[in-house]
Amino acid sequence: MNYGEFEIHALPEGRFTVGVDKVFVPYADGDPPRPGTLFVSVSPFLVQTPSEVLLLDTGLGEYATGRGTDFLLDGLAHHGVTREAVTKVLLSHLHFDHAGGCVATVMDEATPTFPNAEYVVQAGELSAPYGDLSDAARDRIVTALDREGQLVTVEGDGWLTDEIEHAHTGGHSRDHQLFRLHTAGRTVLFGGDVLPTPGQVTRRFQAKYDHDGAASQAWRTQLAREAADGGHLALFYHSTDTLAGFIDDASGGLRVEAVAV
């Protein structure tokens, strides 16, 4: 999708079943569902600007059962992008379903998937208490990125470039962040796991899986209103159908008008 001076593409890894064990198992139509699990989709995004090649989160990578970073790299290759071409990886947080693709195992060692990229994350996420498999995954990822000098930490709200704005949200994790990408008077809004699906635009709830459910709900309400008022393009990382859309007012509330990316 062309949007202002940006070219935007979803890089879907597909659908997965996941249970309380936090194990992501790829799911195909016709597969028997695993008892006690939910369906979830995972989709990083590629954004090409006049001066940058950006990734918004990196998917599961090796943290999906039987998978590696091939799905992500194949998705990039489909759009003519090599791993060496990526200039920045913008991370909403470091749960392994968002940051797993940051590294790949090479000769039994975690190695950055994108050798020329800066990996940008809120500083607080390096020590945020996850309390599950994401702790070990986070530490492995951070160690590899820091060793290669590719880890860039930010604090609070600010701008990386004239195009890239970051804002601390908390909510889903203690130091979760969102990104606003600006081009030719337009804005792309990537809410990470604070606004991961279009269904969360139209429903009010506090999720038990959030670090602070009330904060996440407050941010969802604010971001949906912001996107509707500003005409922003919203990207939905965990949606099973609508990966991007414009939010507008409808009778009785808000609605999402899907667009293809």
Can you annotate each of these PLM segments?
Residues 54-56, 90, 119, 188-190, ...:
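Residue-level marker for buried hydrophobic side chains located in beta-strands
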Residues 185-187, 191-261:
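Cap/insert and terminal regions of metallo-dependent hydrolase folds
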Residues 2-8, 12-79, 178-192:
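Conserved beta-strand hairpin/beta-sheet module of binuclear metal-dependent hydrolase folds
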Residues 77-78, 85, 104, 113-168, ...:
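Metallo-beta-lactamase
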Residues 68-120:
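Active-site metal-binding motif and surrounding structural segment of the metallo-beta-lactamase
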Residues 30-36, 107-108, 166-167:
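Short, P/G- and charge-enriched loop/turn segments at secondary-structure junctions
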Residues 89-99, 169-176, 235-241:
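Histidine-centered catalytic micro-motifs
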Residues 13-15, 58-61, 94, 124-125, ...:
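Active-site metal-binding loops of divalent metal-dependent hydrolases
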